[in-house]
Amino acid sequence: MPGRTRPSCRLAITFTPRPDSATPRAGRAAPATGRRSNRSRSTLSATASPMPRRPHRIRSLGLLDRRDNYLDMLRTGGGIESPLIEAGALSDAMGLEPGCGRLWIKADHGLPVAGSIKARGGIHEVLEFAETLAVREGLLSPGQDCRVLAEPAAREVFGRHQVAVGSTGNLGLSIGVAASALGFRAAVHMSADAKEWKKERLRRRGVEVVEHAGDYERAVAAGRSQAQADPFSHFVDDERSLSLLLGYSAAALHLRGQLAEQGIVVDAKHPLFVYLPCGVGGAPAGITFGLRQLLGPHVHCFFAEPVQSPCFLVQMAAPAGTHPSVYDLGLTNRTEADGLAVPRASLLAAGLMQPLLSGIFTVRDDTLFEHLVRVLDATGERIEPSAAAGFSGPALLTGSDGGRLWLRAQGLDVQLPQATHLVWTTGGLFVPEAEHQRFEARGRSLLEAAA
C-alpha cells in the first residue's frame, strides 16, 4: 500500500462561514462569499424545496435504443443509481486519522448510460424536455405511462427537434446519449479540453460533435448562440439551467435511503461531510442543495477544484455583482481533470451555495493521479482524474490548521469520532483501457518518486 498523503503543502483550502453556526474567529482564512446576479436566467431560494416532480429513476432508456445493452439498468429495475462503498481500507492512505470518522465513497463514476455524475442532471433535463414536448404535441397525458416516448409517433416528433449542449466531455456524453436514444438530433459543442475518446463515443451514437479551439466557456457560448437561432433547438445550459441542477439534487433522495440501509445516522452528534469535485458548479451545487433539504444543517459540503481552475472559489470570494474568471487571477485553466477545466462559475449555482456551502479546496494534478492509484489499490475502483478530486478533503478538514479551526468554530471537533466522510466520485466507467493504464502509470510513478 502506498504511503499516506503528505501534508497539505500541495493544496490550498478556504472555508466559508455557515449562517447557522458560530461566527469565525479572527485570523481564519478569508471567508468566501457568493451573491446572486441577475445575469442568471433562473433563481432558486435556498429555503425552498422544489425537488423534481418524480423520483429520479429512468426506466425507459433501456427500451429506446437496443444498440446499447444496459445490463446495470436491468439489474436495478431501470434506475440510474450508484452504490455507496465503505472505504475504511483507504482511510490511512488518504491521511484520515483514526478517531476522525469513517470514509465512504458515493460511486457515481460507475453510473450506467453516461458513466459519470452527469447522467443525473443531463438525463433528467432531456427527459423533462421530451415529456414537455410530448404533452404539447398531444402524445402524452398527465399520469400516462411515459413509455409512449419510445413509440414511433414520439420519435417522429422528437426527430424534428435538436438537443444541444456545450461541454468538456461528460455532460456531452450524458446529453448526447440520452437525446439520441429518444430520437432527437443531438449536437455537442466540445472545448479544446475534451478527450478524443469522448468525441468518438458520441460520433458512434450519431451525435454531431462540434469542436472548438477555445475553452469550456467559449464552447458553451457558441452552442447557446447557435441554439437561440433555431426555434427547434433546445439548449441544455450548464451555466444557467434549473432543470439540470434539480436533476442533480435528486441524488439526495437515494443517498438518504442508502445511508439508512448502512445504519449511518446524520444528526448533530453524527455529522456528514461530503466532498464533491466542482467544475462550473451545477452538479455539486444541486447535490448540496438536495442534501441540505433532506438531511438538514448537519450535512457539510466541500467543493474540490484543480489548482489552475478554481472558478467556484474565485466566484465565491469575488465582490458583489462581479463575475470573474480564473484568467483574471493569472491562472491557466489547464488541468488533466478535463471535466473541471472551467474558467468561470455558474452564477445560478454560486448564488444558491452562498448560504449552504461549507468550503472549497484546490488540488494539484499530480495529487489527482496519486489518489486515483490509491483508490484502485484499496478498493479496486477505477476512476478518472477529475473523480479523484474529493479525496484530499478528509485529510485537509481533519489535519490542516484551517480545517481544525473551522471544525472548532462549528463545534464539530468533538463529534469527529462519530462523523461520516463521503467522497463523491464523478466519472470513469467508460474510460478506455489505454487511458486507464496511462492514468495508473503516471500515478504510480509519482508515488514511487515520493516514497
Curated annotation (Swiss-Prot):
It comes from the Bacteria. Its cofactor is pyridoxal 5'-phosphate. It catalyses: D-serine = pyruvate + NH4(+). Coiled coil: none annotated. Keywords: Lyase, Pyridoxal phosphate. Residues 22-35 have a biased composition (Low complexity). Its EC number is 4.3.1.18. The modification N6-(pyridoxal phosphate)lysine is found at residue 118. It is an enzyme of class 4 (lyase). InterPro entries: D_Ser_am_lyase, Ser/Thr_Dehydratase, TrpB-like_PALP, TrpB-like_PALP_sf. Residues 1-55 are annotated as: Disordered. GO terms for molecular function: D-serine ammonia-lyase activity; hydro-lyase activity; pyridoxal phosphate binding. The keyword Zinc does not apply. One of its GO terms (biological process) is D-serine catabolic process. Belongs to the serine/threonine dehydratase family. DsdA subfamily. This is Probable D-serine dehydratase. It comes from Paracidovorax citrulli (strain AAC00-1) (Acidovorax citrulli).
